[in-house]
């Protein structure tokens, strides 16, 4: 069983949902970023969703765009990110690690080289934000060759054929987008048809469903679980904590610890 499969089986046995934080690697710098990861895991993160700094992130709102810029301004590249992942994997052999990134970062070294590197450093799953499920075959084949699970986004406007294709191809987890638009902790609305989407995904035997976009409060985690999701992903709210505490790492890690423990507590019934 993959790490994600094992995680969801264990959580189901405990009647818990998953809380998965997202951060951009090497923001604000390599050492602080690793301490951020340690803090997330120590305070209850069930898995990690990690971004690589990129100059033109498509789905990211201003908060995560700023995180990308901080890491890029510090001179951190894909090489540094893979070095960080290897360090995380060495310290935490069981934690599931997913990447959320843009296709350019996969294409530039070639898909084969990228997914080989993912496998060598301990990545479990990759979600390429700007590759729709209809155009995904070559990516899924390249990922599968190296034992990497391919994750796909289910948008709020997905029709039945798209839902069935997502359910067939996605592995590890399904990323259910709360609403159209870009990531933001401020915009906490979600589409009115999420319950129907979740039902359709489950009927199609989809991988476990994690709801993301705008998840910033424990009540939203509980709501996602009530709707039938298997957990929730929070990114902008976490990156915002980093952004407002750049002058005090102690305060940054303390606030992060509190936030993650409260969000994780909301996954327990």
Curated annotation (Swiss-Prot):
Residues of the active site: 49 (proton acceptor), 60 (proton acceptor)
Protein's recorded name: Tryptophan synthase alpha chain
One GO CC term, this protein: cytosol
Record carries keyword Lyase: yes
Family statement drawn from the similarity comment of this UniProt entry: Belongs to the TrpA family.
Catalytic function, reaction form: (1S,2R)-1-C-(indol-3-yl)glycerol 3-phosphate + L-serine = D-glyceraldehyde 3-phosphate + L-tryptophan + H2O
Protein's pathway: Amino-acid biosynthesis; L-tryptophan biosynthesis; L-tryptophan from chorismate: step 5/5
CDD domains: Tryptophan_synthase_alpha (cd04724)
EC number, UniProt record: 4.2.1.20
Stretches assigned to coiled coil: none
Enzyme class per UniProt: lyase
Described purpose of this protein according to its UniProt entry: The alpha subunit is responsible for the aldol cleavage of indoleglycerol phosphate to indole and glyceraldehyde 3-phosphate.
The keyword rRNA-binding is annotated on this UniProt entry: no
One GO molecular-function entry: tryptophan synthase activity
Keyword line: Amino-acid biosynthesis, Aromatic amino acid biosynthesis, Lyase, Tryptophan biosynthesis
Assembly and oligomerization: Tetramer of two alpha and two beta chains.
Gene3D superfamilies per the UniProt record, alphabetical: Aldolase class I
């Amino acid at each position: 069983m993959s790490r994600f499969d094992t995680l969801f089986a264990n959580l189901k046995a405990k009647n818990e949902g998953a809380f998965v934080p997202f951060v951009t690697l090497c923001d604000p710098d390599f050492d602080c970023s690793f301490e951020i990861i340690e803090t997330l895991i120590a305070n209850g993160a069930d898995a990690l969703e990690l971004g690589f700094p990129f100059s033109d992130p498509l789905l990211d709102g201003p908060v995560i765009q700023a995180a990308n810029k901080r890491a890029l301004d510090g001179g951190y590249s894909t090489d540094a990110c893979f070095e960080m992942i290897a360090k995380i994997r060495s310290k935490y052999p069981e934690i599931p690690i997913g990447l959320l990134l843009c296709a350019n970062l996969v294409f530039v070294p070639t898909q084969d080289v990228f997914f080989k590197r993912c496998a060598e450093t301990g990545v479990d799953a990759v979600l390429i934000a700007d590759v729709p499920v209809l155009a995904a075959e070559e990516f899924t084949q390249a990922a599968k060759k190296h034992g990497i699970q391919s994750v796909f986004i289910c948008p709020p406007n997905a029709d039945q054929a798209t839902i069935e294709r997502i359910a067939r191809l996605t592995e590890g987890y399904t990323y259910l987008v709360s609403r159209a638009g870009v990531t933001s902790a401020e915009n906490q609305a979600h589409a009115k048809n999420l319950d129907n989407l979740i039902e359709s995904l489950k009927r199609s035997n989809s991988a476990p469903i994690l709801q993301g976009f705008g998840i910033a409060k424990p009540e939203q985690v509980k709501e996602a679980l009530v709707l039938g999701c298997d957990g929730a992903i929070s990114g902008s709210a976490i990156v915002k904590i980093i952004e407002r505490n750049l002058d005090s790492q102690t305060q940054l890690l303390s606030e992060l610890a509190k936030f993650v423990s409260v969000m994780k507590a909301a996954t327990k019934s």
